[in-house]
């Protein structure tokens, strides 16, 4: 059994359940979206964010992804509306990507794989702590945004420029004055369903908001993301690529659309 989970054949998604039984649960993420089976739910509200760019704190490479961490000690950067019962606090965002431009997203739409997927992780402050929120069905809300290949994205470049400081596993650097809503596509249409974290321990506590419209990045920008290493500074270099979990069974869950 793998001592540490990862994405290789010996410790990858097929083995996660050996250490993390949740990974074989009934409400796992990601899932395949089949748009012909998805119903429009007119009761779904629009969602909105009020993010404070000053709440961005650090960027880090943990060997499995790169993550930007926010100050979530009070209601500073918030997500509201949509399918959610109340406001949620932004805690971090991170990405999943492939080894080339033709795959890398975790969710798929009618069989289409995007180059990458951005996850903005928020938690429900009515549960007082992030740790407590992880135990609740409505504890966490994640906005998922697909990345497709096209023109260069100036806002995304600000994030990419910081990657030079965190090239290897274990590196962390200050990353401030960044409001991630600058990355959002113009269209706010979304799909929503009840699911889990896509990384161990795969807790089933997430209300997903998956945006229909992808954000566009260039092939060069994706190459920059893939230039990160999953190895530490003093180790032989190993590229940080293919950090995505394949789609999981939908079981009895219903995916709803905010749009017709």
From Swiss-Prot:
Lineage, broadest ranks: Eukaryota, Metazoa, Chordata, Craniata, Vertebrata
CDD domains, alphabetized: alpha_CA_I_II_III_XIII
Tissue and organ expression note: Muscle specific.
UniProt-recorded Gene Ontology molecular function terms: carbonate dehydratase activity; nickel cation binding; phosphatase activity; zinc ion binding
The family this protein is said to belong to: Belongs to the alpha-carbonic anhydrase family.
Cofactor: Zn(2+)
Every Alpha-carbonic anhydrase domain range: 3-259
Involved in proton transfer: annotated span: 64-67
EC number: 4.2.1.1
Keyword vocabulary terms for this entry: Acetylation, Cytoplasm, Glutathionylation, Lyase, Metal-binding, Phosphoprotein, Zinc
Subcellular location: Cytoplasm
GO cellular component entries: cytoplasm; cytosol
Regulation: Activated by proton donors such as imidazole and the dipeptide histidylhistidine. Inhibited by coumarins and sulfonamide derivatives such as acetazolamide.
Name of the protein: Carbonic anhydrase 3
Alphabetical list of SMART domains matching this protein: Carb_anhydrase (SM01057)
Binding site for Zn(2+): 94, 96, 119
Processing and modification events after translation: S-thiolated both by thiol-disulfide exchange with glutathione disulfide and by oxyradical-initiated S-thiolation with reduced glutathione.
Domain of life of the source: Eukaryota
Residues of the signal peptide: none
Catalytic activity: hydrogencarbonate + H(+) = CO2 + H2O
Residue numbers binding substrate: 198-199
Modified residues (N-acetylalanine): 2
PROSITE patterns reported for this sequence: ALPHA_CA_1 (PS00162), ALPHA_CA_2 (PS51144)
Pfam families according to UniProt: Carb_anhydrase
GO biological process: response to bacterium; response to ethanol; response to oxidative stress
Leading EC class: lyase
List of residues that carry S-glutathionyl cysteine: 182, 187
């Amino acid at each position: 059994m793998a001592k540490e989970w990862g994405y290789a054949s010996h410790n990858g998604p097929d083995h996660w359940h050996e250490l993390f039984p949740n990974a074989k649960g009934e409400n796992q993420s990601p899932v395949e979206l089949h748009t012909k089976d998805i119903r429009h739910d007119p009761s779904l509200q629009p969602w909105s964010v009020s993010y404070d760019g000053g709440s961005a704190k650090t960027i880090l490479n943990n060997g499995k992804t790169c993550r930007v961490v926010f100050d979530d000690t009070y209601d500073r950067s918030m997500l509201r509306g949509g399918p959610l019962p109340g406001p949620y606090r932004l805690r971090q965002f991170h990405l999943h990507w492939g080894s080339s431009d033709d795959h890398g997203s975790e969710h798929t739409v009618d069989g289409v794989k995007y180059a990458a997927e951005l996850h903005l992780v928020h938690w429900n402050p009515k549960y007082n702590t992030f740790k407590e929120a992880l135990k609740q069905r409505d504890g966490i809300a994640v906005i998922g945004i697909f990345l497709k290949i096209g023109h260069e994205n100036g806002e995304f470049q600000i994030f990419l420029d910081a990657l030079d400081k965190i090239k290897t596993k274990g590196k962390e650097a200050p990353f401030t004055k960044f409001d991630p809503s600058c990355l959002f596509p113009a269209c706010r249409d979304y799909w929503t369903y009840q699911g889990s974290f896509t990384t161990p321990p795969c807790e089933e506590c997430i209300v997903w908001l998956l945006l229909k419209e992808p954000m566009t990045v260039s092939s060069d920008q994706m190459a920059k993301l893939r230039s990160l290493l999953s190895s530490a500074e003093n180790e032989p270099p190993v590229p940080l690529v293919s950090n995505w979990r394949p789609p999981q069974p939908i079981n009895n869950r219903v995916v709803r659309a905010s749009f017709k």
